[in-house]
A protein has these predicted regions:
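Short beta-strand-to-loop element that shapes/binds the nucleotide-sugar donor at the catalytic cleft/hinge
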Residues: 135-154
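Non-catalytic, C-terminal membrane-associated alpha-helical segments of glycosyltransferases
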Residues: 246-307
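A conserved acidic beta->alpha catalytic loop
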Residues: 51-61
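A recurrent flexible, glycine/aromatic-enriched loop bordering the glycosyltransferase active site
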Residues: 169-190, 257-259
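A conserved hydrophobic helix/loop-capping motif in glycosyltransferases and polysaccharide synthases
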Residues: 8-24, 31, 51
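Short beta-strand-to-loop acidic/aromatic patch adjacent to the donor-nucleotide binding site
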Residues: 102-114
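Short, acidic, metal-binding catalytic loop of nucleotide-sugar glycosyltransferases
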Residues: 26-44
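Glycine-rich, basic loop-to-helix element that forms the pyrophosphate-binding segment
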Residues: 79-99
Length: 307
């Protein structure tokens, strides 16, 4: 019997990180090739949908050449440089939905993430786990470790330790998939039926939090959200720690701090939106603390230590 190809739309967005983006696409192609060699249930028919969000360093052109060399279909769409992560990923996802092909899965992939050679086997194994355990496919987040340090986990999925304060614990691999409360989209594998149920990333997000919202809303709908059984890729944690950001903000004037916190990369707006949509009971207190963060940063970080 002839095996059916599994159709996967790969979704990425990029902005002036040519070398990182090329490394990501190279490991993607390696993982696809590895799966084609070892697959027992059909090959992958993949196509890359990349948002070029105002790149000036030739990222999109270099990716196009790499895809041509590696025989990977691609559609590259231009942004204006102001889409940021959430906007760029939404645009790539919308392009995939408009494509003439009908996709079985969508793989959201950060351009600073390097896939393990057997990444697709891990993702499909996690889907089989969802089917066996929950009776349906779900959202799978690939666990990532720091580059060159497999003992330090960086992204994947988290479970709440205290839902009211939003304290969370990052899951580490245990040899089988684990259910999580919310998931990161460094490597996020979404079946088409989930998209039919809840659509794509919510349009209100500019940069961050959209992946957390998406996975949390899926859990509310009864859709399983799990992490892979093993490390699925590598990606360095690129967010400043509390000590560094508190030192930076406390040294700023009020005007500097306000402008900093208005920038999409640091804005409170995405976090407040996520809180209002996912944890509305926590929103008033979160809004208050965000104001304290702006007006009284020393007091805010003193309170943070007391949590």
């Amino acid at each position: 019997m002839m095996k059916k190809d599994i159709k996967i739309a790969i979704l990425m967005t990029c902005h002036n990180r040519k070398e990182k983006t090329l490394q990501c696409v190279s490991t993607l192609c390696d993982a696809l090739a590895r799966y084609h060699v070892s697959a027992s249930d059909g090959n992958i028919d993949a196509k890359l949908f990349l948002t070029d969000d105002g790149c000036t360093d030739g990222t999109a052109e270099a990716v196009g050449r790499e895809c041509h060399t590696r025989n990977l279909q691609r559609t590259i769409v231009k942004g204006d440089g102001n889409l940021y992560w959430a906007g760029g990923m939404r645009l790539a996802w919308m392009m995939a939905l408009k494509d003439e092909q009908s996709w079985n899965y969508y793989l959201l992939l950060n351009d600073d993430t390097l896939l393990q050679p057997d990444a697709f086997s891990m993702l499909f194994n996690a889907q089989r786990y969802c089917l066996d355990t929950y009776g349906c496919e779900g959202i799978v987040s690939g666990i990532t470790s720091a580059i060159g340090d497999s003992s330090t986990m960086t992204y994947g999925g988290e479970v709440f330790v205290n839902k009211f304060t939003c304290r969370r614990r990052l899951l580490t691999p245990i040899g089988k998939p684990q259910l999580c409360d919310w998931a990161h989209a460094n490597i996020l594998f979404v079946p088409h039926q989930v998209v039919e149920t809840q659509g794509i990333l919510y349009k209100g997000y500019v940069h961050g939090q959209a992946d957390l919202d998406y996975s949390y809303k899926a859990r509310q709908r009864g859709i399983p959200v799990v992490v892979t059984a093993q490390i699925c890729g590598t990606c360095n944690f690129d967010h400043p720690d509390v000590a560094a950001i508190s030192k930076l903000l406390c040294a700023m004037t009020f005007s500097e701090r306000r402008n900093y916190l208005k920038h999409p990369l640091h804005s409170d707006a995405d976090y407040l939106l996520m809180t209002r949509r996912c944890m509305p009971q926590k929103y008033p207190l979160t809004w208050l603390f965000r104001k304290i963060h702006l007006y009284l940063p020393h007091f805010y970080y003193w309170l943070h230590k007391k949590r």
